[in-house]
Amino acid sequence: MCKKRNAEINAEFDIIKKYCIYIGNIPFFASKNDVVVKFAEYGETCNIYMQSNKPHCDVKPAIVRYRSRKSVDKSLCLNNSKFGNTILIVLPLSLPYSRYLLTYDTCIVVYINDKNSCKTSMAELYDEFQKIGDIQNMFKTTNNMIYINFESEKSMQLSLATKPFLINNNIFKIKKVERNINMCGLNSESQDFSTNLKKKLLYNRSIGIFGLPSNATEERIAQIFSRFGDIQKITLICDVVGNSKQYGFIYYKKRTSANAAKVIMDGENFEGNKISVRFVPEKKVFKN
C-alpha cells in the first residue's frame, strides 16, 4: 500500500512540477509570507515549501507553486534580481537536472574572508563581476563560498585575470571550478526530492472558501467543514465595518483533512451559494 501511495504521489508531483519554480539564495531573514508577497505579483500562488536556515549560510532555498503555468514564465524575470543583499536564482522546477548545473568551463568560485567590519554581500559581488561579463547565475553554499557562472568562457577567463580582487578593502580568492556544480540547494546530489517535500507542495493544511453567503459565520463554517478533520483556525474575512467579503480560510491540523475538504466541497452548495474551495499558502490563514 505504501509503495502504491508513493507511486501516486510521484505521478501527481510530475504534473504539478510544471506549475512550480525553484528559488535559491533567499535571505535568511525572509519568511514564507515575504516570498509569497514578492512572487504573487506574477500570479496566484497556492503553496510554498521553504527549507530552514542552514548552518554557516545566510541564504536558503524554496519552491513556490503557482495556479497557472503562465505565472511560472512571468516570474523567471526575477532570476539574478536582488532580494535584500542577495541575488536570487529563479528557475522552473520542471527543468531537467542538467539545467541546474553550473558548468565548470564558465564558472568560478569566490572565497570570502572579510577581515574588517564592512562585510561584502552577494549583491556587491554581482555588481563588480557583472562589469567583467554577463552573469548567468550565482550560488552561495556557505557564508565564505560563492559560485559565479558566466554566460561565456571568455568572461570566466577575464575574471580569473583580475585576482587578487578587492571589495570593501577585503581581498577575495578566486579559483576556476574543476567540475559541474549543482545549484539546487534542496539536494546536493540530484533533484530526486523527498516524498515529504512532494506532499507539502501537493497538499497543504490551508484552504480558501470563496463565494460564501454574506451571512455566513465562522461557527457555521466550522459545523460544515469539521467533518473532514480537526480545524485549528477559521478566518472569515470582513471589511473595516465588519461586513463579510464572502470568503474565508480554514487551517486544518492535517493535510489529508484539507485535501478531503477541497475535493468534496469545491463547487458544492453552501446555504444557497455555490462555493469554490482551493488550497492557499498556509501563511494566508493567519494574515488577518
From Swiss-Prot:
Domain RRM: residue ranges: 19-94, 108-179, 205-282
Gene3D superfamilies according to UniProt: 3.30.70.330
**One cellular component term from this protein's GO annotations in UniProt:** U2 snRNP
**Gene Ontology molecular function, alphabetical:** RNA binding
Might you name a Gene Ontology BP term for this protein?
Answer: cell differentiation
Transmembrane intervals? none
Effects seen without this gene: Feminized males, which display features such as the absence of one or both gonocoxites and gonostyli, or antennae with fewer and shorter setae than normal males. Mosquitoes shifts the alternative splicing of dsx and fru toward their female isoforms.
- Asked whether the UniProt record includes RNA-binding among its keywords, one would answer yes
**InterPro entries listed in its UniProt record:** Nucleotide-bd_a/b_plait_sf, RBD_domain_sf, RNA_proc/Spliceosome_comp, RRM_dom
**SMART domains attached to this UniProt entry:** RRM
Keyword annotations for this protein, in alphabetical order, are: Differentiation, mRNA processing, mRNA splicing, Repeat, RNA-binding, Sexual differentiation
> Function, please?
Male determiner protein (M-factor) that controls male somatic sexual differentiation. Acts as a dominant factor that regulates the mRNA splicing of doublesex (dsx) or fruitless (fru) transcripts and promotes expression of male splice forms of dsx and fru.
What's the protein name?
A: Male determiner protein Nix
The gene designation is Nix
